[in-house]
């Protein structure tokens, strides 16, 4: 209540304000192949004030099948209508998960797009990054979350986390660790971007993100 009291006038103005009213954020998850990270994202946001829609251009892919299996809001989105869809739908963020096509340049004018990549960019940009990093014999690889723009050669990095590759590490073990790390890092970064907050490694560590299971994590801090 706002009260104005003068010698000549007395005004009482009652203003109704809703305090603590939460605004539902809208997240789109776009994929067309594997579902490695999808379940981790959905689990992380379960019970949070985030409306999630899973989008794919392939109804037969693992990603789309897993989304339907988990009873998530799913939509088949043909590649040709990407621009039309994202221009007409109010989405706060589009998280790309193993989408196998190059998005149209016009799409990036409509929403914020981020992507997760299984290497420490700018190293091993492009497809098959996990196997290429391993075959190259690097001793440190990892995961990168970055903004997607029309310039595919420009990586606006949001977050990175390393994995040490020991001499006796087999490829299957390395690949599994990359996928595990993606599943832990990506949901936290998505949450931060939705809140317009800056990602900090302390958020990842306090959430139990790194338990030392990736070989040499203790030496990274």
Report residues per predicted region:
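One-carbon transfer enzymes
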Residues: 2-221
């Amino acid at each position: 209540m706002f009260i104005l009291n003068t010698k000549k006038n007395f005004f009482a103005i009652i203003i109704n304000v809703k305090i603590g009213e939460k605004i539902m954020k809208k997240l789109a998850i776009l994929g067309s192949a594997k579902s490695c990270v999808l379940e981790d994202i959905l689990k992380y946001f379960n019970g949070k004030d985030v409306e999630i829609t899973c989008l794919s251009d392939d109804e037969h892919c693992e990603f789309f099948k897993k989304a339907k299996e988990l009873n998530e809001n799913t939509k088949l989105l043909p590649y040709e209508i990407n621009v039309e869809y994202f221009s007409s739908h109010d989405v706060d963020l589009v998280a790309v998960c193993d989408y196998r096509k190059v998005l149209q340049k016009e799409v990036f004018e409509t929403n914020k797009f981020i992507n997760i990549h299984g290497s420490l960019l700018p190293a091993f940009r492009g497809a098959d990054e996990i196997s290429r990093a391993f075959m190259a014999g690097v001793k440190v690889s990892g995961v990168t979350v970055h903004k997607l723009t029309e310039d595919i050669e420009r990586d606006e990095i949001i977050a990175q986390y390393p994995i040490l590759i020991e001499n006796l590490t087999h490829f299957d073990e390395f690949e599994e660790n990359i996928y595990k790390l993606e599943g832990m890092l990506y949901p936290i970064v998505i949450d931060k971007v939705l809140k317009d907050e800056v990602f900090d490694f302390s958020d990842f560590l306090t959430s139990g993100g790194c338990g030392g299971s990736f070989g040499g994590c203790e030496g990274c801090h």
